[in-house]
Amino acid sequence: MGLELGVGYCASVQSQLVAVTYDTQDPTDLAQFWATLLGREPVEDADGVLLPGADGQVGLRFQAGGAPSRGLHRMHLHLTSTSLLDQQHVVATAVELGASHLDLGQRPEEGHVVLSDPGGYEFCVIEPGNEYLAGCGPLGEVSCEGTRAVGNFWSEALHWPLVWDRDEETAVQSPRGGTKVAWSGESASSQQGNDPQRFELVVAGGDLEAEADRLAGLGARRVRAAGHGVILMADPDGIAFRLRAH
């Protein structure tokens, strides 16, 4: 398939976080929206449309599925900006491509702009000068609901250090830098394997079953086989993720 892993690749690490997957009624259109916004090239394959990550940036995958669930989703993206003008440009580009503004009660002095993409998924364009996301790249963070325990699980699963651990909130980041993945400290609501957003992990140069056992030993559980060379698993909060052979 020619995947570009691009996220903290290390030959000694089995599980690689290749992408965050989004279910959507129109994978091609939503992938093109994000490809334009992030400056990436979409790659079509048997699992949908992938926007590979590079230079520490987490990949995004768009897969055919039902309409997004109503209400706020448990995961959203944080895009960075280099200046106020750049932030305004990113927002204007997103709206021109089909995004819409979203009022979640945020105050003007907070600085960030909340939007909904054409698939109904929330994301934020963060104000310039945000020290927490400094140097993380255009896709600064994947922000998730989830407990401190699940943040610790993913740190061990990916061999990514905790870069934030305060008041039950956690965040991990590849040793090579790039996109952070963060959890709010609050329990996430699982949809029993039908979550429209999930992590996609690849076992690089190792045994799929052995890696599934390793993750289970860290607190995950097997849900079911999901096709040849794919195992659907759940993290300690019960949130589904896909583990597949390279």
Regions found by a protein language model. Name each.
Residues 108-110, 226-228:
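Short, small/polar residue-rich loop motifs at catalytic or cofactor-binding pockets
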Residues 6-45, 51-103, 116-167, 172-224, ...:
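Glyoxalase I/VOC metalloenzyme domain signal
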